[in-house]
Structures are given as structure tokens and as C-alpha cells.
Amino acid sequence: MFGELRDLLTGGGNETTTKKVKGTVVLMKKNVLDFNDFNASFLDRLHEFLGNKITLRLVSSDVTDSENGSKGKLGKAAHLEDWITTITSLTAGESAFKVTFDYETDFGYPGAFLIRNSHFSEFLLKSLTLEDVPGHGRVHYICNSWIYPAKHYTTDRVFFSNKTYLPHETPATLLKYREEELVSLRGTGEGELKEWDRVYDYAYYNDLGVPPKNPRPVLGGTQEYPYPRRGRTGRKPTKEDPQTESRLPITSSLDIYVPRDERFGHLKMSDFLAYALKAIAQFIQPALEAVFDDTPKEFDSFEDVLKIYEEGIDLPNQALIDSIVKNIPLEMLKEIFRTDGQKFLKFPVPQVIKEDKTAWRTDEEFAREMLAGLNPVVIQLLKEFPPKSKLDSESYGNQNSTITKSHIEHNLDGLTVEEALEKERLFILDHHDTLMPYLGRVNTTTTKTYASRTLLFLKDDGTLKPLVIELSLPHPNGDKFGAVSEVYTPGEGVYDSLWQLAKAFVGVNDSGNHQLISHWMQTHASIEPFVIATNRQLSVLHPVFKLLEPHFRDTMNINALARQILINGGGIFEITVFPSKYAMEMSSFIYKNHWTFPDQALPAELKKRGMAVEDPEAPHGLRLRIKDYPYAVDGLEVWYAIESWVRDYIFLFYKIEEDIQTDTELQAWWKEVREEGHGDKKSEPWWPKMQTREELVESCTIIIWVASALHAAVNFGQYPVAGYLPNRPTISRQYMPKENTPEFEELEKNPDKVFLKTITAQLQTLLGISLIEILSTHSSDEVYLGQRDSKEWAAEKEALEAFEKFGEKVKEIEKNIDERNDDETLKNRTGLVKMPYTLLFPSSEGGVTGRGIPNSVSI
């Protein structure tokens, strides 16, 4: 009591006391991740020794800095301790450093901190954790950002604690930091971007060609070639064409600009991916060309094809091997080539031929893969017979189907065509209208192919039976004269061989559609604008940023590598996929005529194809027209789990609709997605208006679904299903043999040889399976749906609990998938190839597993 009285009389007791607050910084030093930079570690230690340290300062959420406008008060500078002596690793190169702050007791909550790097090289800052902060206990900051030397920034870098704030809820002391951080991420829109830049900006796909010898049209920004935007690099235009951006040499592919925090850099697996892609483009392709220059470029039999899995391809060129060793870190070699450098390119046996080497050829498996294969997003309910084209008849003449009742009625298990239509038992795989506008041009290349329609019948046991295949060419006198079509049905003898060839042409159509549309355009390309807009317009403090950010990991990096090596003019896609140099142009045509944002929702997409119908009695009010449709059954479980989690989360932060309408960052984000990211579609009436919580829930669910589950469904089965190329040929090189010709005679004598001469050649086969093996591989540090790479991603207990509930639901889905795969009455789950459908099984280990839903389009 006397003490209190004394303080009252003397004004004592108000003085600020200082306490030591201890923290732990987790980071990865540059040399852990960089194979070639051995100097970085030494120079950083030298800088540290000379007093050039890493400095941190806390920022108060509660107390204003009188000298710094409305910004929060800054604490005293603190330094990372023991940089020189700390060599202990936590996991995969992570190091933990102590830091001690002088903490004034009236400082309040430390809502952010500033960091300055005075070392020679950059490091990856993972997190800062403070213990025993007066009045607040433990405070955690998630960073996951590269910190370059201070000379590369105009201000110190800022990081916020894991509390979540809508813009109007942000403490006034942090608001300026929040706004300034977004401004710096948007950049100025000028100049070439450098590796330390953090700028997210938009550009057209104008870097795919090399004029004048290998030009490609600019995709995006025109009515003729609309396209989603990609990340801007700011490279100069070519001298020959100011509309085309200059390209990096292939040897510098790994240096292509993406914002630094979007670049691969977790474990070796990410680097393995990048180096392996480079190896294919730079070394393996010319090596294979050299080997096959002196040998016939054909497989003579299916046994020949099997040898590439059982024996491997011998590349005896020692000079080539030496050049690979020089260009690829030694520790990568064994992983990429699986040998000591002599006989490489030996491939693992794809799952589709593991149990039975011939079941892939059956009609049952051909049909089953439309429901449970690589491209299960195309098959439709047939609503009219014969099928009609939607192409403009003035431009393309009569493109309607020439299939008649007599082609199929004998095969409908006693039903008439009308009855089969009425009972919803006829289905179509239709690659006619999407391909026909380009077919004449595609067939001027080495490709020789058709536009196809395949009709199928739903049998009583729930499986599909192929009935008929129609193969069409443009009229020789011009497109406007319509299509010239041939119809093929199952047969005996040589007619069975014709039927097998017809199925191969359907496979070629479907492979191209899968790779360019279902995979590249609908997941990789369409998601990138959301990645860019989210980083430009939503602060890391924003609840929607925290919701979506895990679903964007590595997407910009893999897409940039794709522009450099895969989808560019003369790149691996053009070499291995049938549309050749028209591949990307075709994907623009599909984006223009078929892509809408609301239809990316799985329920909407299934209804659009007639594969599902609203039914109040069915789970979630949706009934599948084919009950045993593995992609749709598993997919809907995953979709509704995502939607439920998103709704729980969004409703935590947005209590009323007005919260959505007055959220300045959210409205700017959605405006930019529509007007910039998908700017060629900005006037479409179907865009959600973003005025209600349900509109936000649906939009975020679509984004997460596309980035995670849809991408997994069309990507990670590539090697298991298509690694055996006769099952999913990607190119056709000669037309169907006609009766009374030498080609038809050869088909009668040696049907397998004709089949193999028709589909993908030996060189493209090896290139193609080299690529899809890499694309089907999970990295060892992958983060899967229902998981986060940090348990402290948010400070709000309710958000963490909602996510935990989602994680439990995901585990339940895994059990359900296992049970369905064990159910022998569900014949489409495994088929004659004895390959269970696991592409939407959420978790996986690393490698080629044919299962696992990573959070993002990360490969």
C-alpha cells in the first residue's frame, strides 16, 4: 500500500520496464538448395564476422510510432545469434537460430516484424516463433519467403503474425504495412524482372514461338485467340516481331522468371523434376534421334514395346553421357537415369499391363477408361440419334453423324435405338466438333488423323459396351463441303483389326484432348490468373488468401517451365501430341468456345454432360446416370468435402452478406480475376457477382477443386495408364487402310505391325513416356488435400478446428474408396486390367503411385 501511495505522489510506477523475449527463427541457407553455389556459405560467414548481420525488429499492433506516421511502434533491433557456428539441421536443410528481443512491457501485441539481410546471399525464411510475450504468450509468424540482401529492396521486409484480419478489421498500426506490401507485390509493370523480384503481373502467351523460323500466334488479348494470362517476365520483344517476347536459351530454362517465392526449392525432388525436364529437352531427345538415325524407327511387335520396360534402351554415345554429366549435378544422375550412365532409359512397368499384358486391347477396357481413366471428363449422355454437330454449317457444311440404326441396333441387348435413348443407356465420346475446325491443317503435318465419334451402350451390369466408331475427314474440296466419314463396328478377322485401329484413332483424339484441354488448359493455364490476382490483391492477413494460398504452390514455376520446354513451338508437346504445331492454338479455340468458370464446378460439369441429374432423393440432390462412374463417385465426395470446409471457414470471417460487399481487397481481387486474369472473358454474364457469402464459397470451392482434385484426376495416372503407349497412342501417322489396297493386305497378314506403324513412332514413344513418368511423380515433400505444411497457419482456434474436421472427412473418403475398389459388383473400379481406381484417393507417398491429391497444380 505504501508503495502504491509513493507512486501516486511521485508519478512512479508508469515507467516502462524491459523484458527479454526469446524467439526461434527457422530458415534454409542458400547453399542447402543450390548445388552450384559453394561460395555463399563462406561469404555469409565472413559478412557475419565483420558485423553485417541479419536484423529483426518487432512492430506493435497496439502502440503507434510517433515518428512514423500511423505505423506501429518499432522495437529495438535484434540479431540472429550464432550464424557462424550453427550448422545443425532440423529437416531437409532447415536451421534454427535463436534471437532475443528487448521487449518493453507497454509494447502491446507484436503484430508484425521487419527483417533486413546484410549478408552476401539470400536465405529462405520459414518462420519466427516468440515465446512468453508479456500478456500474449506464444506468437507465431509464418514467412516462407526468400530474403535477399538489403540492396535489392527499398524497405525492410515485413511479416505478419498468423492472426487473420479483413481489411477494415486491421489494426491501424498495421494497415500501412498491409497496403505497402501489396503495392510492392504488384510492381510497376515496367522492365525485365530479376530473380530477387517478388512481382506478380500479367502477360499474354507471347513467348512460345521464335519468329521468323518458328512463329506461333500470341494467345490472349484478341477475339481470335483468347486465353488466360500468364505471369509477366518483362523480357524484351524479339527483333523480328515486336509482339513476340524473346525466349531464354534452353540451357537457361531453369532461370525463367517467376516471383522468387513461387520458385521450386523445397526438397531435391523439385530440383529433380526441373533437371529431368531439362535433360529430356536438351540431351535425351538428340540422343535418341542419333541412335534411331541408323535404325528403323518402328516397333515391329508388341514384344518390342515391352522390351523398353524389361531391358531398356542402350545409348552407347559416351560423348553424350559426358555432356550430361557436365550439365546436370552428379547426385541427380542416378535418379534421372536410374543407372550409372551406360544403359539408361529403362522404364518401370506401367500399371495397365502389370497384371495382364493384353487386357488393354479389350472393348471393355477401352470403354472403362472413359469413366475411370486419364480423361474421364469428356463422355456424355447421347440425347439425339444420329448425333448432330454444333459447328456453323455455313463454314463447315454438314457435319452431322452418318451412323445409322443398322450400325448399332443389333447390339443393344434387345432394345431399339429409341428405347435405348429413352432409358438413358446411350453415351457418346465426341471428339468431332472440337477437332474438325483444325483437322485439315493438322493433317498437313506428319500427323494423319480423323475427328471421331464413339457411341457406347450401358449394359445391365453397369459397364459400357462400345457400339460404333465414326472417323471423319474434312471434304477434299474444302471445309464448307462438310465431312467425309467412315463408320466402323466390332467384327471378326481383318474387320476386328480395323476395329482395333479405329479404337487407336479414338485414343489419339482423346490423348490430345486430355493433354491440351483437360490437363493443360483447364487446370494449369486457368489457375495461374488466380495465383497472380490473389498475391496482388489479397494481403497475407486476409482469410481468403490463407484459404487459397496452399492451392497455388509451384503452379507458376511449373507453368513457366512448361512455356520454356513443353508447350513452346517445337517443344515436347508438339513432338509427342498429334496436333503438332497447332496444339496451343487448338487449346485457345476450346477456351474461347467452351470454358466457363461456373462449369468448372464438378456437379455443374457432370450435369452439363448429361452424366448427372438433379434428384432430391439422391445424396446431395444429384443422381449419376451411370451409377458406377468412379471419377464422378469419388469426385463428388471430394467436391462436397471441400465445399463444406470452405463454407465453415468463410462463415467464420464473414458474418453477413454486407461483409462481402464492403471487403475492398476481396472486391478488387475478383474484379482483377475477371478483367485481367481471364480478361478475354470479362464481359461474360456467367461470372459470379461476388455479393454473397455463397458466391464466395462456390468460387473458392471451384478454385480449390480445379487446383487439387481435378488436376490429380487428369495428371497422376499418366504413367500408370498411358506409360504403355499402345494403350493411349498420342500420334497417328497413316490413315485407315482401304479394302483392295496393299495396306489392307498387310493388315490381313500382320495386324500388329500395321497397328504399330500407324500410332506413335519409337522416338516419340520414348520421349512421351520419359515426360509422363516425370509428370506422374509425386515429390517426397508433397502436401496433400486435408494437410497443411504448418499446423499454425492461422491463430484462430475455430479455423484450425474446421480444417481438422476437413482432414478427418478426407480420411473417411479414403476408406470409402478402398471399400468401393474391393466391391466386385462395381466392375468399372478395376476392370480386366485389374487396376483399382485410386486417382482421387487423397494421400500418397512420393514417386509414381497412381494416387494422391496434392493441394496444388505442382507438376
UniProtKB/Swiss-Prot annotation:
It is an enzyme of class 1 (oxidoreductase). PROSITE patterns: LIPOXYGENASE_1, LIPOXYGENASE_2, LIPOXYGENASE_3, PLAT. Keywords: Cytoplasm, Dioxygenase, Fatty acid biosynthesis, Fatty acid metabolism, Iron, Lipid biosynthesis, Lipid metabolism, Metal-binding, Oxidoreductase, Oxylipin biosynthesis, Plant defense, Stress response. Induction: By pathogens (e.g. Pseudomonas syringae), wounding, abscisic acid (ABA) and methyl jasmonate (MeJA). Higher levels in light than in dark conditions. Induced by infection with the fungal pathogen Fusarium graminearum. Binds 1 Fe cation per subunit. Iron is tightly bound. Residues 213-246 are annotated as: Disordered. Pathway: Lipid metabolism; oxylipin biosynthesis. SMART domains: LH2. Residues 164-859 form the Lipoxygenase domain. It catalyses: (9Z,12Z)-octadecadienoate + O2 = (9S)-hydroperoxy-(10E,12Z)-octadecadienoate; (9Z,12Z,15Z)-octadecatrienoate + O2 = (9S)-hydroperoxy-(10E,12Z,15Z)-octadecatrienoate. Its cofactor is Fe cation. CDD domains: PLAT_LH2 (cd01751). Signal peptide: none annotated. It comes from the Eukaryota. It is found in: Cytoplasm. Belongs to the lipoxygenase family. Monomer. This is Linoleate 9S-lipoxygenase 1. The lineage of its organism: Eukaryota, Viridiplantae, Streptophyta, Embryophyta, Tracheophyta.
